[in-house]
Design a protein with these regions (language model features):
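Residue-level recognition of tetratricopeptide repeat
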Residues: 26, 60, 94-95, 129, ...
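Helix-start (N-cap) detector for alpha-helical repeat units in TPR-like alpha-solenoids
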Residues: 18-19, 52-53, 86-87, 121-122, ...
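Terminal, low-structured helical/coil segments at or just beyond the last alpha-helical repeat
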Residues: 4-10, 257-286
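Register position in tetratricopeptide repeats
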Residues: 30, 64-65, 98-99, 133, ...
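Canonical tetratricopeptide repeat
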Residues: 23, 57, 91, 126, ...
Length: 286
């Protein structure tokens, strides 16, 4: 309350007009005085309730303050003032998608944004994300295709398109998309790793191992790539390589990987192997 009174005292000394409050809000926002900026925009709106920019920037400030429900409503008010404005719909959609996890509302906002800017990459991509998170993979893929129409070599659209095909139960299409993402970012850990997971599930184990090895060249500290490679080697009967990979995984995350190895039937062929048992014993929970 003391802070609020201090801000009000300073601002009330200024000419009592919409423009002065609005400009003061912009100045305070640049200084990252978000609460002071919020007060200023709200005072501006008392004089000019139908001002698009005051509602829009109020939404930005509320986002900065972590007040996401209020931010979405402020963007909605801005959109009511200027229904044909892309940004109020897009930013409102981003709040619903990323912060509030209200994916259907996010989609409705992105659709409105796209109606005003049909070829926009970002609204199409984020619409795809909302559909993917709702498990509506067909529409997610259609949205990613729209995004790729704007940016044909966009890594994220190809990668998330791969995620959608994977979760939709189409591993071959997923592999194609991850490989395309890799063409754009050859040193991307995740595209290599996701290919490995799919190839492992398809029992194409040597190919899966090759992908895990590539991912580990980029990030040697990933426990799951080491663990999954160990599983592949164990399934192929290559016990020494399986143990070596498992050792790396256990050195990074002994509790999780140790529990997985103790309960995974793929290692049943190693249960009588002294090195394997010693390895698990050394990394057993204290």
């Amino acid at each position: 309350m003391t802070y609020l009174l201090t801000v009000y005292r300073a601002l009330e000394c200024r000419p009592d007009t919409y423009r002065d409050w609005y400009d003061q809000g912009n100045i305070l926002r640049e200084r990252m005085d978000y609460l002071g900026a919020l007060i200023s925009y709200e005072k501006a709106l008392e004089y000019y309730p139908d001002d698009y920019w005051a509602w829009y920037k109020r939404g930005m400030i509320l986002e900065d303050l972590g007040m996401y429900e209020e931010a979405a409503q402020s963007y909605a008010n801005a959109a009511q003032v200027k229904d044909d404005n892309y940004w109020a719909w897009y930013d409102q959609g981003c709040v619903y998608l990323q912060e509030l996890k209200e994916y259907e509302k996010a989609i409705a906002c992105f659709q409105r944004a796209l109606s005003h800017s049909p070829g926009d990459y970002w609204a199409a991509y984020r619409q795809g994300e909302a559909y993917r998170l709702l498990k509506n993979y067909e529409r997610a893929i259609t949205s990613y295709d729209l995004a790729l129409g704007a940016r044909p070599r966009d890594y994220w659209a190809w990668y998330r398109r791969g995620d959608a095909f994977r979760d939709w139960g189409n591993p071959q299409e997923a592999l194609f998309n991850y490989r395309t993402a890799l063409d754009i970012r050859p040193q991307d850990y995740w595209s290599w790793y996701q290919q490995g997971v799919i190839l492992q599930a398809l029992q194409r184990l040597p190919e899966a191992i090759a992908c895990y090895e590539e991912s580990l060249k980029i990030d040697r500290d990933d426990r799951y790539a080491w663990y999954n490679a160990a599983c592949c080697y164990a399934a192929l009967g290559q016990q020494e390589k399986a143990i070596n990979c498992l050792r790396e995984a256990l050195d990074i995350e002994p509790d999780i990987c140790g529990e997985l190895a103790r309960n995974n039937f793929v290692f049943d062929g190693l249960r009588q192997n002294e090195t394997f048992n010693d390895l698990l014993s050394c990394h057993s929970p204290s």
